[in-house]
Each structure stands twice: as C-alpha cells, then as structure tokens.
C-alpha cells in the first residue's frame, strides 16, 4: 500500500519542494552529458524561484533553532550518547551560522551573472535554448564535462547553506 501524506503548512511544503530539487541537483551535477548539466541549470533556476519566498530563510532558521532546543533537552539522559548529541548540535549550529551569515536569499548572487540570467529568461520558452538562440550557452555545453561541473559547482555554492539547513 502506498501512503500519501499531505503537509498542510505552506512552509513545510516549500521545504519539501526544495529538498526534492536539491536531491535532483545532486544527481545531475556529477553526470557527464551536456543535457544533464542543462537540467542541472534548470533545477538551479527552480531552486532560486522556490527560495525567493521572503520568509523562507527565517523559517529554516526557526526550524534549526527548534531542533537544537529539543536536542538540548536530551542532555544528561543516560540513554543518549553525549558525544553523538554534541556532534548533531554542532552540525545544527554550523548550518544555522552559515545560513544566517548569508546575505539575501539563496541564489541571489547568481542574479548578478548576466550570462546565467539570459539563459534563465530563455529556458522556460519551449525550444528557447537552441544553439542559434543562445550560442554562448551552446558553446558552454560543448566544454569538457569536468569544466562544466566546475562551473556548476561555483554557481551553486551559494545554495549549499540552505541545503545543509534543510538536510538537518
């Protein structure tokens, strides 16, 4: 039997959408084919769209703080490993700090990249990323897979604090 759970809270639904998109992104980036890197960029743009919600960052920070408070309540419990508890609380603290220190929304730094934004504006148009519409993008797709992966890693670097916060 398949069980479908419907989260009623819009904030939780948004976080689940982002979790899904980050999972897709981490599957696509390591691949070698240009089409996989095309869809990795599509996913980056989708993450930027979903993450553009004004209160998302504060919602994730509140969730991290809530989890930290719950875990602190387990201190002194003889059935809980203090070392494991300290490790998880440390991970939460690191994720909280990284996300809190990030200026603006996730992916906001990418909006300054005119080349990426030209792709973003054409990517939703059916067939809008043809080689004659975006010759520079077509040329990028012809680069070696490792070079494309390095570019993707550089572009998605600003998204990782949010991903790490969601993972916890």
Q: Can you say where each PLM-predicted feature lies in the sequence?
A:
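Surface-exposed peri-terminal alpha-helical interaction modules
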Residues: 1-168
């Amino acid at each position: 039997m398949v069980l479908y759970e419907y989260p009623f809270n819009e904030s939780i639904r948004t976080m689940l959408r982002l979790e899904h998109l980050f999972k897709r992104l981490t599957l696509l980036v390591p691949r070698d084919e240009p089409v996989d890197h095309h869809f990795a960029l599509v996913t980056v743009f989708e993450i930027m769209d979903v993450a553009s919600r004004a209160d998302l960052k504060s919602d994730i920070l509140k969730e991290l703080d809530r989890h930290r408070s719950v875990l602190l309540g387990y201190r002194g419990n003889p059935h809980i490993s203090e070392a494991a508890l300290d490790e998880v609380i440390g991970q939460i603290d690191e994720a909280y700090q990284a996300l809190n220190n990030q200026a603006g929304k996730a992916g906001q730094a990418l909006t300054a990249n005119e080349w990426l934004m030209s792709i973003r504006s054409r990517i939703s148009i059916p067939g809008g990323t043809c080689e004659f519409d975006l010759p520079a993008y077509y040329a990028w797709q012809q680069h070696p897979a490792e070079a494309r992966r390095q570019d993707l890693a550089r572009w998605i670097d600003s998204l990782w604090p949010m991903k790490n916060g969601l993972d916890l």
